Structure formats: C-alpha cells, structure tokens
Amino acid sequence: MSNGFAIRLGAVMAAVSLVAVGCSTTDTATENKHALAASAVTVADQWVKAAPSGMTGLFGTLKNAGEHGVTVVSASSPVAGKVELHEVVGQAGGGSVMRPKDGGFPIPAGGTHVLAPGADHIMLMDLKQPLQVGKDVEVTLSFEDGSTLPFTAQVRDFSGADESYKPAG
C-alpha cells in the first residue's frame, strides 16, 4: 500500500467516524433529555387508601431536585384497569368536585407537588383486586418528556376527610 493511498484512506475513515459520532451525539442528547425528568424526581410518604373494589386514591409528595420544572402527565398500575391524575375543585354553590386534572401535575425546579386527600391525587380505578392494609402497590409515573418513574406505595386504612370514591353520575 502506498503512503498516498494510506493517507487518503485514513482521511476518509476519519470523516466517516466524525459523521457517525455526530449522529450518535444527537441520539445520546435525546436519550439524556428523556431520562432527565424521571431522574430528578423522587416520591416520598406515598400511600394508597385501602379499598375492597372499585376505586381509591394514591397520595404522597413528588419532589423535583432538578434545575428545570417537570410535569407528570399520567400514571399506571397493574392493580387498576385505569389510572387518572385528579384534582378537587370548589363549586360555586358550595362543596367540591373531583375531576381529571388537565395538564397533569407540574413540579417546579427544586420544588414539590403534594398529593393529598381532598386535593390533587392519583385515582386507581377499576381495581383488579382488593387493596388490603399493609400490602404494597406498584405505580409508574410518566412525564411529559417520555421518561418514567416506578415506585411502590403502601396500602393504609384511612377514614379522614370522609372521602368516598364512586363513579360520577
């Protein structure tokens, strides 16, 4: 192999390598962005209200240790046929109503979002099994960037706030 040919071959290989690295950097940056929301958030003091059937609420505190705000857009759990993010809002004539929360649960940078009875919470609907006190429930949060955060929540007996979860209507 002549020196001229080897130099040209080396130059072509270097150019191909740069193009490949450039393409993979974009993919890596996208993957890092997708991992960002879930990796910045922790769930604390999480629990689920015990229920024999139907539906129930999940509560706790979502903490964002990141430098950017994130938004939880959905949740899932193998114990429920359907899971929704809910809010409780006051009505003009008094009382309050529970409804799906448009836009999800925003968590500011360095802040928290509390899920509590009578306020924002996660609804586990169409329960597939009784949720008994002391058991754990698997839940996965999904964020607007596509990342996910799995966690478990303990089932507890709770009669405070006198909440009764029933379908509307």
What are the language-model segments listed below?
Residues C23-D27:
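Bacterial signal peptide processing site
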Residues N32-D136, S142-G169:
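Compact, glycine-rich, soluble single-domain proteins
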